[in-house]
Amino acid sequence: MQTMKANVFRGPNKIGIEEVPRPSAGVGEAVIRITLTTICGTDLHILRGEYPVKPGLVIGHEPVGVIEELGEGLSGYKIGDRVLVGAITPCGQCRACLSAQWAQCGHGEGVEAIGGWRFGNTINGAQAEYLLVPNAQANLAKIPDELSDEQVVLLADIASTGFSGAESANIRIGDTVAVFAQGPIGLCATAGAKLIGASLIIGVESDPVRMEMSKRMGAHVVLDPTQCDVVAEIKKLTGGGADVAIEALGLQVTFENALRCLRPGGTLSSLGVYSGKLQVPYDAFAAGLGDYKIVTTLCPGGKERMRRLMSMVQSKRFDPLPLLTHRFKLDQIVEAYTVFGSRREGCLKVAIMP
């Protein structure tokens, strides 16, 4: 039996590199040799026991690699093709997929599975030397020769999620947008709001490194919530309230502030992953009479979504490389989690290379 190195979750705060069986491709599946992956904030939730997955699972859900094996039923691919696979792997055939709700494919699978999020949730994930890709025809996106692995790895999740937060909010040309938290996803939401055409983008962040990166990604103003009343400042800057607020942290306080900073009829786009109960204060949405909209988003996946995101990088409309601040080998995965989780040395995202 062939084996490989992989980062295995063994319980809260217990991960590490182990030798595990190497996957083989069945019908409609492919095996890719991982050339680059990363760590997501959701992986931290898993590590801390805040999101339940089964012990023994290989975690990680942001894979870039080379096709090593193709199962029966696949066409248009060959061994050796460089591919990007989204964090969400839609089947392309179910009711959700046929309704263009790709992220909700297979809702209800596994242990509290969320839609089409399978890697590192219900099946083995990408922090390994090899990865089995289900529904490969719908999910293997070929990488253009002129793009490097580092240019595309963040498209699998944080760019797709952040952009989707802006898209789901239906930002219109000239809208005012406040983005709460400028972590990796919030920064991508800021970039997405800029690309769509917001006239004023207000970032909310207290970390100096992230405040500066927020401006680089497109924020016109960045407010430090430890130094001012951000709701009052946003209302002042926007003349009464933002058209759109994007919440990208997953805390009660940021959700509530995002709701309170809106104009009547405004939209709150929620991207954060919440660990506890979330409450909507009676007065924050005018007792239900303020025409507010609250929308939620799970990272869109599938090869067409990945192709579109890669085209944005290829045309130089979006540059994700500044977000990739640290690099580690797979054998250093525990250290990588520590650096990423503690934001040490201004860490935003880490590259993991087998």
Place the predicted regions along the sequence by residue.
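Mid-domain Rossmann-like dinucleotide-binding core that forms the NAD(H)/NADP(H) cofactor-binding site
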Residues: 83, 142-228, 232-233, 244
